């Protein structure tokens, strides 16, 4: 699937939003529950030839299967109005800059229209759905930039963890170029590299592929 474009195949009628919420409440794994929610939201937007991308801290949580947790689910959307309409039908209420669903324990923040870069976007399959997640390379640079700007040790730690876990999959040429543009220094791999399966066991059920 091409990032930012919907499939042109025939779609069966989607389940009603309330029915989806009812099913999500039954999912005991918090990360999987979030990903199923995002998958449903992605599916509804795809039907209208629009897209959402998972970015920020929730993308880090997803790639690390919960090693780093976050509060808000940060997404970008090519159609904010439609996205907000779907959230409303799912029982989310707007509170300032975020949409909150207390029953699901979720808060969604629509941060922009589209990510700055989409060429390294990954597709993660969960249940019957597919979620677009910002690429590892772009996420590492994003965390490094945040660490530099805010002098944040946590963001630097996240960048290091992502780099160590996915070092064999990273497009180093692309990463170096992006880091240079943002004027950030790349982390050095630790002597003991953490393998992706060790670090992200949930991804055994949420298969990541190049978009």
What spans do the regions from the language model cover?
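Compositionally biased terminal segments of proteins
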Residues: 2-211
């Amino acid at each position: 699937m091409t990032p930012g474009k919907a499939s042109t195949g025939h779609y069966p009628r989607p389940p009603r939003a309330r029915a989806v919420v009812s099913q999500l409440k039954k999912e005991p794994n918090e990360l999987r529950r979030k990903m199923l929610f995002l998958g449903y939201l992605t599916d509804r937007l795809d039907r209208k030839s629009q897209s959402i991308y998972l970015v920020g801290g929730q993308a880090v949580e997803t790639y690390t299967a919960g090693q780093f947790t976050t509060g808000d689910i940060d997404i970008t959307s090519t159609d904010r109005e439609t996205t907000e309409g779907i959230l409303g039908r799912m029982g989310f209420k707007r509170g300032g800059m975020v949409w909150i669903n207390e029953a699901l324990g979720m808060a969604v923040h629509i941060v922009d229209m589209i990510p700055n870069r989409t060429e390294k976007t990954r597709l993660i399959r969960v249940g019957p759905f597919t979620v677009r997640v910002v690429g590892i390379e772009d996420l590492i640079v994003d965390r490094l930039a945040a660490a530099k700007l805010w002098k944040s040790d946590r963001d630097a730690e996240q960048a290091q963890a992502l780099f160590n876990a996915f070092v064999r999959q990273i497009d180093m040429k692309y990463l170096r170029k992006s880091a240079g543009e943002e004027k950030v220094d790349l982390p050095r791999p630790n002597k003991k590299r953490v393998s992706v399966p060790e670090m992200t066991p949930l991804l055994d059920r949420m298969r990541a592929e190049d978009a």
